[in-house]
Amino acid sequence: MKTVSQLIDMKQKETKISMVTAYDFPSAKQVEAAGIDMILVGDSLGMTVLGYESTVQVTLADMIHHGRAVRRGAPNTFVVVDMPIGAVGISMTQDLNHALKLYQETNANAIKAEGAHITPFIEKATAIGIPVVAHLGLTPQSVGVMGYKLQGATKEAAEQLILDAKNVEQAGAVALVLEAIPNDLAEEISKHLTIPVIGIGAGKGTDGQVLVYHDMLNYGVEHKAKFVKQFADFSVGVDGLKQYDQEVKSGAFPSEEYTYKKKIMNEVNNND
Protein backbone atom coordinates (compact mmCIF):
# COMPACT_ATOMS: atom_id res chain seq x y z
CA MET A 1 0.00 0.00 0.00
CA LYS A 2 1.27 3.46 -0.91
CA THR A 3 1.76 5.98 1.89
CA VAL A 4 1.47 9.76 1.70
CA SER A 5 5.25 10.06 1.77
CA GLN A 6 5.55 7.54 -1.08
CA LEU A 7 3.02 9.49 -3.16
CA ILE A 8 5.01 12.67 -2.57
CA ASP A 9 8.15 10.77 -3.56
CA MET A 10 6.45 9.71 -6.80
CA LYS A 11 5.73 13.38 -7.52
CA GLN A 12 9.33 14.36 -6.84
CA LYS A 13 10.57 11.60 -9.15
CA GLU A 14 8.00 12.61 -11.78
CA THR A 15 6.36 9.18 -11.66
CA LYS A 16 2.71 9.63 -12.58
CA ILE A 17 0.09 8.52 -10.04
CA SER A 18 -2.92 6.48 -11.16
CA MET A 19 -6.22 6.78 -9.32
CA VAL A 20 -9.61 5.22 -10.06
CA THR A 21 -12.97 6.01 -8.52
CA ALA A 22 -14.62 2.76 -7.39
CA TYR A 23 -17.62 2.10 -5.18
CA ASP A 24 -17.87 -1.58 -4.19
CA PHE A 25 -16.03 -4.79 -3.36
CA PRO A 26 -15.69 -6.34 -6.85
CA SER A 27 -14.63 -3.13 -8.60
CA ALA A 28 -12.13 -2.33 -5.83
CA LYS A 29 -10.75 -5.85 -6.08
CA GLN A 30 -10.18 -5.39 -9.82
CA VAL A 31 -8.59 -1.98 -9.35
CA GLU A 32 -6.15 -3.38 -6.79
CA ALA A 33 -5.36 -6.38 -9.02
CA ALA A 34 -4.51 -3.93 -11.82
CA GLY A 35 -1.93 -2.22 -9.61
CA ILE A 36 -3.63 1.20 -9.52
CA ASP A 37 -1.97 3.49 -6.95
CA MET A 38 -5.07 5.02 -5.33
CA ILE A 39 -8.82 4.48 -5.11
CA LEU A 40 -11.34 7.27 -4.58
CA VAL A 41 -14.72 6.36 -3.15
CA GLY A 42 -16.47 9.38 -4.62
CA ASP A 43 -19.88 10.73 -3.78
CA SER A 44 -20.56 10.35 -7.51
CA LEU A 45 -21.69 6.90 -6.40
CA GLY A 46 -25.05 8.60 -5.87
CA MET A 47 -25.65 8.83 -9.61
CA THR A 48 -23.46 5.95 -10.77
CA VAL A 49 -24.58 3.10 -8.53
CA LEU A 50 -27.52 4.38 -6.45
CA GLY A 51 -29.50 6.04 -9.23
CA TYR A 52 -29.81 9.45 -7.57
CA GLU A 53 -30.13 12.55 -9.71
CA SER A 54 -27.12 14.24 -8.11
CA THR A 55 -24.64 13.99 -5.25
CA VAL A 56 -26.96 16.12 -3.10
CA GLN A 57 -28.88 13.02 -1.97
CA VAL A 58 -25.77 11.12 -0.86
CA THR A 59 -25.47 10.70 2.91
CA LEU A 60 -22.62 10.02 5.29
CA ALA A 61 -24.11 6.56 5.83
CA ASP A 62 -23.91 5.91 2.07
CA MET A 63 -20.24 6.87 2.01
CA ILE A 64 -19.42 4.70 5.02
CA HIS A 65 -21.27 1.71 3.53
CA HIS A 66 -19.44 1.93 0.21
CA GLY A 67 -16.12 2.92 1.76
CA ARG A 68 -16.13 -0.23 3.87
CA ALA A 69 -16.88 -2.39 0.83
CA VAL A 70 -14.04 -0.82 -1.14
CA ARG A 71 -11.57 -1.28 1.71
CA ARG A 72 -12.50 -4.97 1.93
CA GLY A 73 -11.95 -5.31 -1.80
CA ALA A 74 -8.68 -3.38 -1.83
CA PRO A 75 -6.94 -3.91 1.52
CA ASN A 76 -3.54 -2.95 0.09
CA THR A 77 -4.42 0.20 -1.86
CA PHE A 78 -4.44 3.84 -0.70
CA VAL A 79 -8.17 4.59 -0.33
CA VAL A 80 -9.69 8.08 -0.16
CA VAL A 81 -13.37 8.51 0.80
CA ASP A 82 -15.46 11.59 0.00
CA MET A 83 -17.13 13.74 2.62
CA PRO A 84 -20.67 14.12 1.21
CA ILE A 85 -22.56 17.38 0.97
CA GLY A 86 -23.62 18.67 4.39
CA ALA A 87 -20.86 16.78 6.20
CA VAL A 88 -18.63 19.88 6.15
CA GLY A 89 -19.72 23.45 6.78
CA ILE A 90 -22.19 23.17 9.64
CA SER A 91 -19.95 23.74 12.66
CA MET A 92 -16.34 22.80 13.23
CA THR A 93 -17.23 20.37 16.00
CA GLN A 94 -19.83 18.61 13.87
CA ASP A 95 -17.58 18.66 10.80
CA LEU A 96 -14.76 16.99 12.71
CA ASN A 97 -17.14 14.41 14.18
CA HIS A 98 -18.32 13.55 10.66
CA ALA A 99 -14.74 13.34 9.41
CA LEU A 100 -13.64 11.13 12.29
CA LYS A 101 -16.61 8.82 11.84
CA LEU A 102 -15.96 8.47 8.10
CA TYR A 103 -12.22 7.97 8.56
CA GLN A 104 -12.49 5.43 11.37
CA GLU A 105 -15.45 3.39 10.13
CA THR A 106 -14.15 2.98 6.57
CA ASN A 107 -10.51 2.43 7.56
CA ALA A 108 -9.61 4.83 4.75
CA ASN A 109 -6.16 6.33 4.27
CA ALA A 110 -7.63 9.80 3.81
CA ILE A 111 -10.90 11.65 3.37
CA LYS A 112 -11.66 14.15 0.60
CA ALA A 113 -13.47 17.46 0.96
CA GLU A 114 -14.45 19.98 -1.71
CA GLY A 115 -13.96 23.70 -2.07
CA ALA A 116 -11.60 26.51 -1.14
CA HIS A 117 -13.67 27.51 1.89
CA ILE A 118 -12.70 24.41 3.88
CA THR A 119 -9.12 25.40 4.74
CA PRO A 120 -9.97 25.84 8.46
CA PHE A 121 -11.48 22.35 8.44
CA ILE A 122 -8.36 20.91 6.77
CA GLU A 123 -6.20 22.49 9.49
CA LYS A 124 -8.31 21.09 12.33
CA ALA A 125 -8.72 17.63 10.78
CA THR A 126 -4.99 17.41 10.13
CA ALA A 127 -4.29 18.45 13.72
CA ILE A 128 -6.26 15.48 15.07
CA GLY A 129 -4.62 13.04 12.66
CA ILE A 130 -7.08 12.82 9.78
CA PRO A 131 -5.38 13.14 6.36
CA VAL A 132 -7.41 15.30 3.97
CA VAL A 133 -7.33 15.42 0.18
CA ALA A 134 -8.60 18.76 -1.15
CA HIS A 135 -10.69 19.20 -4.32
CA LEU A 136 -10.73 22.41 -6.38
CA GLY A 137 -11.96 23.49 -9.80
CA LEU A 138 -15.26 21.87 -10.73
CA THR A 139 -16.66 20.56 -7.45
CA PRO A 140 -19.65 18.25 -8.04
CA GLN A 141 -21.40 19.27 -4.82
CA SER A 142 -21.56 22.85 -6.14
CA VAL A 143 -22.76 22.19 -9.69
CA GLY A 144 -26.18 23.53 -8.77
CA VAL A 145 -24.50 26.93 -8.52
CA MET A 146 -21.47 26.56 -10.80
CA GLY A 147 -22.87 24.22 -13.45
CA TYR A 148 -20.89 21.55 -15.27
CA LYS A 149 -18.42 23.77 -17.07
CA LEU A 150 -14.71 24.53 -17.31
CA GLN A 151 -13.40 26.34 -14.23
CA GLY A 152 -10.50 28.80 -13.99
CA ALA A 153 -11.19 29.98 -17.53
CA THR A 154 -10.64 33.70 -16.85
CA LYS A 155 -7.52 35.49 -15.59
CA GLU A 156 -9.18 36.30 -12.27
CA ALA A 157 -10.53 32.78 -11.78
CA ALA A 158 -7.17 31.23 -12.65
CA GLU A 159 -5.34 33.47 -10.18
CA GLN A 160 -7.86 32.58 -7.49
CA LEU A 161 -7.41 28.85 -8.13
CA ILE A 162 -3.64 29.18 -7.81
CA LEU A 163 -4.10 31.00 -4.49
CA ASP A 164 -6.67 28.45 -3.27
CA ALA A 165 -4.35 25.57 -4.13
CA LYS A 166 -1.52 27.12 -2.13
CA ASN A 167 -3.89 27.70 0.77
CA VAL A 168 -5.14 24.10 0.98
CA GLU A 169 -1.56 22.84 0.89
CA GLN A 170 -0.58 25.26 3.65
CA ALA A 171 -3.59 24.11 5.67
CA GLY A 172 -2.21 20.57 5.60
CA ALA A 173 -3.88 18.78 2.67
CA VAL A 174 -1.96 15.63 1.70
CA ALA A 175 -3.02 15.82 -1.96
CA LEU A 176 -5.19 17.89 -4.28
CA VAL A 177 -7.72 16.89 -6.94
CA LEU A 178 -8.17 19.43 -9.75
CA GLU A 179 -11.24 18.95 -11.93
CA ALA A 180 -12.19 20.51 -15.27
CA ILE A 181 -9.64 23.33 -15.50
CA PRO A 182 -7.31 24.40 -18.33
CA ASN A 183 -4.28 22.18 -18.87
CA ASP A 184 -1.70 24.95 -18.48
CA LEU A 185 -3.29 26.16 -15.24
CA ALA A 186 -3.28 22.65 -13.77
CA GLU A 187 0.36 22.22 -14.78
CA GLU A 188 1.29 25.54 -13.16
CA ILE A 189 -0.45 24.60 -9.91
CA SER A 190 1.23 21.19 -9.89
CA LYS A 191 4.66 22.79 -10.27
CA HIS A 192 4.10 25.16 -7.35
CA LEU A 193 2.84 22.58 -4.84
CA THR A 194 4.87 19.97 -2.99
CA ILE A 195 1.84 17.68 -2.52
CA PRO A 196 0.59 15.41 -5.33
CA VAL A 197 -1.95 16.99 -7.69
CA ILE A 198 -4.36 14.54 -9.32
CA GLY A 199 -6.26 15.74 -12.36
CA ILE A 200 -9.60 14.82 -13.88
CA GLY A 201 -10.25 16.79 -17.02
CA ALA A 202 -7.18 18.89 -16.22
CA GLY A 203 -4.74 17.70 -18.88
CA LYS A 204 -1.50 15.77 -18.54
CA GLY A 205 0.51 18.36 -16.60
CA THR A 206 -0.68 17.12 -13.19
CA ASP A 207 1.10 14.54 -11.06
CA GLY A 208 -1.54 11.91 -11.75
CA GLN A 209 -4.96 11.17 -13.19
CA VAL A 210 -8.29 9.91 -11.86
CA LEU A 211 -11.22 8.47 -13.79
CA VAL A 212 -14.43 6.77 -12.68
CA TYR A 213 -14.41 2.96 -13.02
CA HIS A 214 -17.83 2.89 -14.66
CA ASP A 215 -16.96 5.67 -17.13
CA MET A 216 -13.63 4.29 -18.30
CA LEU A 217 -15.06 0.77 -18.72
CA ASN A 218 -18.43 1.83 -20.19
CA TYR A 219 -20.32 0.10 -17.43
CA GLY A 220 -23.91 1.29 -17.12
CA VAL A 221 -23.25 4.92 -18.04
CA GLU A 222 -25.26 6.94 -20.56
CA HIS A 223 -23.25 10.15 -20.73
CA LYS A 224 -19.51 10.59 -20.44
CA ALA A 225 -17.58 13.83 -20.06
CA LYS A 226 -15.20 15.05 -22.77
CA PHE A 227 -12.17 14.02 -20.73
CA VAL A 228 -13.21 10.35 -20.32
CA LYS A 229 -11.40 7.75 -22.42
CA GLN A 230 -13.03 4.32 -22.69
CA PHE A 231 -10.45 1.61 -21.95
CA ALA A 232 -12.82 -1.39 -22.14
CA ASP A 233 -16.49 -2.05 -22.91
CA PHE A 234 -18.43 -3.70 -20.10
CA SER A 235 -21.71 -2.92 -21.88
CA VAL A 236 -21.26 -6.21 -23.78
CA GLY A 237 -22.55 -7.82 -20.60
CA VAL A 238 -26.04 -6.94 -21.84
CA ASP A 239 -25.53 -9.40 -24.69
CA GLY A 240 -24.79 -12.13 -22.16
CA LEU A 241 -27.94 -11.28 -20.21
CA LYS A 242 -30.02 -11.46 -23.39
CA GLN A 243 -28.55 -14.87 -24.22
CA TYR A 244 -29.33 -16.06 -20.69
CA ASP A 245 -32.93 -14.93 -21.05
CA GLN A 246 -33.26 -16.76 -24.38
CA GLU A 247 -31.73 -19.99 -23.06
CA VAL A 248 -33.94 -20.02 -19.95
CA LYS A 249 -37.04 -19.55 -22.08
CA SER A 250 -35.97 -22.20 -24.61
CA GLY A 251 -34.92 -24.69 -21.94
CA ALA A 252 -31.32 -24.76 -23.18
CA PHE A 253 -30.14 -23.65 -19.74
CA PRO A 254 -29.34 -25.38 -17.51
CA SER A 255 -27.88 -28.24 -19.54
CA GLU A 256 -26.36 -31.37 -17.94
CA GLU A 257 -23.03 -29.56 -17.71
CA TYR A 258 -24.53 -27.18 -15.14
CA THR A 259 -26.67 -29.74 -13.25
CA TYR A 260 -25.76 -31.89 -10.23
CA LYS A 261 -25.67 -35.54 -11.33
CA LYS A 262 -26.81 -37.20 -8.12
CA LYS A 263 -30.24 -38.83 -8.32
CA ILE A 264 -32.25 -38.94 -5.09
CA MET A 265 -35.90 -39.58 -5.96
CA ASN A 266 -35.51 -43.39 -6.25
CA GLU A 267 -34.35 -43.44 -2.64
CA VAL A 268 -37.21 -41.18 -1.60
CA ASN A 269 -39.78 -43.29 -3.44
CA ASN A 270 -38.41 -46.56 -1.99
CA ASN A 271 -39.12 -45.23 1.51
CA ASP A 272 -42.80 -44.74 0.71
From Swiss-Prot:
Pfam families: Pantoate_transf. It is an enzyme of class 2 (transferase). One of its GO terms (cellular component) is cytoplasm. Pathway: Cofactor biosynthesis; (R)-pantothenate biosynthesis; (R)-pantoate from 3-methyl-2-oxobutanoate: step 1/2. Its cofactor is Mg(2+). Keywords: Cytoplasm, Magnesium, Metal-binding, Pantothenate biosynthesis, Transferase. 3-methyl-2-oxobutanoate binds at D43, S44, D82, K112. It is found in: Cytoplasm. The keyword Cell inner membrane does not apply. InterPro entries: Pantoate_hydroxy_MeTrfase, Pyrv/PenolPyrv_kinase-like_dom, Pyrv_kinase-like_dom_sf. The active site is at E179. Its main location: cytoplasm. Its EC number is 2.1.2.11. It catalyses: 3-methyl-2-oxobutanoate + (6R)-5,10-methylene-5,6,7,8-tetrahydrofolate + H2O = 2-dehydropantoate + (6S)-5,6,7,8-tetrahydrofolate. GO terms for molecular function: 3-methyl-2-oxobutanoate hydroxymethyltransferase activity; magnesium ion binding. Catalyzes the reversible reaction in which hydroxymethyl group from 5,10-methylenetetrahydrofolate is transferred onto alpha-ketoisovalerate to form ketopantoate. This is 3-methyl-2-oxobutanoate hydroxymethyltransferase. The lineage of its organism: Bacteria, Bacillati, Bacillota, Bacilli, Bacillales.
